[in-house]
Swiss-Prot record:
GO terms for biological process: ribosomal large subunit assembly; translation. GO terms for molecular function: rRNA binding; structural constituent of ribosome. Keywords: Ribonucleoprotein, Ribosomal protein, RNA-binding, rRNA-binding. Binds directly to 23S ribosomal RNA and is necessary for the in vitro assembly process of the 50S ribosomal subunit. It is not involved in the protein synthesizing functions of that subunit. InterPro entries: Ribosomal_bL20, RIBOSOMAL_L20_CS, Ribosomal_protein_bL20_C. One of its GO terms (cellular component) is ribonucleoprotein complex. This is Large ribosomal subunit protein bL20. PANTHER family: 39S RIBOSOMAL PROTEIN L20 (PTHR10986). Transmembrane segments: none annotated. Gene3D superfamilies: 6.10.160.10, Ribosomal protein L20.
Length: 134
């Protein structure tokens, strides 16, 4: 049985690591040990920031919705509350896009939200509102 030497696989691994470290500064781009540490760390940051990215986008959508809704005299929280009470289920990404690209449709949603809030203030319960809407 032939002896297995691992030079080929080691070389391939090293090459893969150095390729991933391309563009790094200093020794990190051309020595295996430093490059491996830098690449491992960069993967940790990438993993973490994929989660953070979702949070950042949600915050951006909420800021945009809040800015658009304030033009109609509501706050973000009251607007979302009104949408929930009116039974309108639209996610924040879509609301944000509507506020930017389709202001008329967004205005209709704001009016529906206001109507739901005003009706519930007068009527008192959500069940009465839902039966009145249907």
């Amino acid at each position: 049985m032939a002896r297995v030497k691992r030079g080929v696989t080691s070389h391939a691994k090293h090459k893969k690591t150095l390729k991933a470290a391309k563009g790094f500064y200093g020794r990190r781009k051309n020595t295996i040990r430093a490059a491996k540490a830098a690449v491992d760390r960069s993967k940790q940051f990438a993993y973490r920031d994929r989660k953070v990215n979702k949070r950042n986008f949600r915050a951006l959508w909420i800021q945009r919705i809040n800015a658009a809704v304030r033009e109609f005299g509501l706050t973000y929280g009251r607007f979302i509350d009104g949408l929930n009470k009116a039974g309108i289920e639209v996610d924040r990404k879509v609301l944000s896009d509507m506020a930017i690209h389709e202001p008329a449709a967004f205005g209709a949603l704001v009016e529906a939200s206001k109507k739901a809030l005003a009706y519930l203030k007068d009527a008192g319960t959500a069940n009465e509102f839902e039966s009145a809407v249907r």
